[in-house]
Structures are given as structure tokens and as C-alpha cells.
Amino acid sequence: NTEAAYDALSNGMKTLLANRRARHEINESVATVHPVIRTHPVTGRKSIYVNDIFTRGIVNLPPDESDAILPFLKRHVQRPDFTYRHTWDEGDVVIWDNRCTQHYAINDFEGRRVVHRVGFFAEPFAE
């Protein structure tokens, strides 16, 4: 829950991150910049938008400062109190809002399973 993770930041950290942008890279030729803090277009709640896989650095910060803050944020959003772990049973349906969550699939299910993924398109983030 990246909204709860944002809410738990100190006011000083929230101020430091306000209007900051981070570089996200899939590889050297595919990169973009996103706000570190995003606002949900429906609820208006703020959330942290960094992740272990793609977020490489906070732009317009000295590298040593970015290198200190970014790992903190990545660990912070993964804290157990912001995490939901589902134990699957037959017939389960799980729905989440990708605008304020991060997800990671764990292969902890023995046997065959069928997964259907559905995407809904909504308003873009207010940036």
C-alpha cells in the first residue's frame, strides 16, 4: 500500500520529496521520468512511486543524496505493515488498484492454477 507508506513518512521527508522526479529504466534504451510522489486521480491521496526493479535515481539531486534516499524509499514501501500476502484457495479473486499498490508474484502454489488478469483504464495521475 504505497499510500499508507507515504502517510507514514515524516513531514520533513514528505517536503523533501514533494515535486521530485525519479528516473525509471527498463534498459539503457527505454527510460522515463516519473514523480516520486503521485496523487491518485480519484481519491486525491498521495503515494510513493519508486520500485526495486526500474527506479534508478532521483533527478536534480546529487548522486550521493539520491543513492541514500532511494534505497530507504524502496525498503520503506516493502515494510510488512504496508504489505498484504494472499494465501490462495480455489475460487479466490483478488482485486487491487495499481495506482497505489506494488505487487510481486510468488510461486508458492503447488499444482496447476489458472490466472486471469484484467486491466481497467482510468484517469491518468494528477502530476
How should these model regions be labeled?
Residues N1-V93, N98-E127:
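Non-heme Fe(II) oxygenase catalytic core, chiefly the N-lobe of the double-stranded beta-helix
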